[in-house]
């Protein structure tokens, strides 16, 4: 996956979370369609500048691989939490400004001023593809550990 392929996905209507989740078909046992649908509402921090959609998709992938689904399964829950915290640590090393779109972009898409800045500087195509690539890289590392 490259920044260019991510940008091309964006141009075709596939958003950040969908791009990230879609890279993990084999690891999750889910189809590309299912992964994209699962992450379809995350774009631009749920269009509020909140938690980055790529990060939310990473959490979904971690949950699909390591999540617990039975009451009292503290061991599995513990493993999932360790993976999530490791992802947070590694992503935070790359993006110390935070996990929210408005922090990562330096502008809040949910405000007219922020939306204007994002559009004028083309941040969704200049910055977000790199973030998506970094999320995938970090997540692959976390899964392999």
Roles of regions detected by a PLM:
Residues 81-145:
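C-terminal binding/interaction regions
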Residues 3-11, 41-50, 120-124:
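A short glycine/serine-rich beta->alpha loop
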Residues 12-16, 30, 127, 131:
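Short, contiguous, pocket-lining structural segments
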Residues 1-27:
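Active-site-proximal helix-loop elements at catalytic-domain edges
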Residues 26-37, 64-86:
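Phosphate-handling active-site elements
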Residues 20, 38-43:
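Short alpha-helical scaffolding segments that buttress acidic/His motifs in well-ordered protein cores
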Residues 57-65:
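DPxDG-like acidic metal-binding loop motif
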Residues 35, 47-54:
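Active-site nucleophile and cofactor-binding loops and adjacent substrate-binding regions
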């Amino acid at each position: 996956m490259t920044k260019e392929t991510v940008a091309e996905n964006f141009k075709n209507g596939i958003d950040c979370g969908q791009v990230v989740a879609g890279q993990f078909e084999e690891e999750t046992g889910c189809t590309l369609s299912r992964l994209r649908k699962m992450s379809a509402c995350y774009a631009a921090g749920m269009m509020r500048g909140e938690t980055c959609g790529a990060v939310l998709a990473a959490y979904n992938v971690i949950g699909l691989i390591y999540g617990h689904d039975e009451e009292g399964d503290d061991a599995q829950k513990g493993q999932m939490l360790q993976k999530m915290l490791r992802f947070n640590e590694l992503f935070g090393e790359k993006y110390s400004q935070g996990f929210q779109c408005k922090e990562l972009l330096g502008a809040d898409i949910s405000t007219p001023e922020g939306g204007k800045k994002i559009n004028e500087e083309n941040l969704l195509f200049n910055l977000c593809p790199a973030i998506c690539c970094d999320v995938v890289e970090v997540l692959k590392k976390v899964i392999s550990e």
